[in-house]
């Protein structure tokens, strides 16, 4: 069984991640991974970039102009195309992805974790910044996100 793991590092300068993410560099050195340096769209906000990366379209076409613009995108995207081909997808990421590629609006109860065999994102685990402040840290720790990602990469029976 072949698997593809796409890792997007948001807000980390290219030189820093190449220097600091030794485990990923190890995969590259062993031939188990490849690195692509991408050029950002403008505006270079997270939501705008996510929409462009997964649809291949510029903001002028998909209409996501910043993090406040959220809706279900009605364009072919990586998740829907992979699912159409009969394969499974998974995402451990920000709730923007659920809203863009699964359904809008994001529901904190129903959409935080789901397994939907017929959906564009077959297995989804999402975090959100909703309610985040200095007193209320809503974002899960990196170790929790990577543990969840590891579980999604295990064979599903």
Segments and roles (model prediction):
Residues 8:
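Generic enzyme active-site microenvironment
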């Amino acid at each position: 069984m072949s698997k593809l793991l796409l890792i997007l590092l948001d807000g980390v300068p290219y030189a820093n991640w190449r220097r600091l993410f030794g485990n990923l560099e190890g995969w590259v050195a062993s031939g188990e991974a490849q690195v692509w340096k991408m050029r950002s769209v403008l505006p270079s906000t997270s939501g705008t970039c996510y929409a462009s990366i997964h649809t291949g379209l510029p903001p002028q076409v998909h209409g996501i102009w910043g993090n406040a613009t959220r809706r279900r995108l009605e364009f072919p995207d990586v998740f829907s195309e992979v699912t159409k081909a009969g394969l499974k997808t998974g995402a451990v990421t920000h709730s923007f992805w659920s809203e863009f590629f699964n359904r809008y609006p994001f529901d904190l109860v129903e959409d935080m974790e789901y397994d939907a065999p017929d959906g564009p994102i077959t297995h989804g685990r999402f975090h959100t910044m909703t309610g985040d402040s200095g007193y209320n840290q809503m974002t899960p720790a990196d170790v929790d996100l990577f543990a969840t990602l590891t579980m999604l990469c295990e064979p599903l029976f």
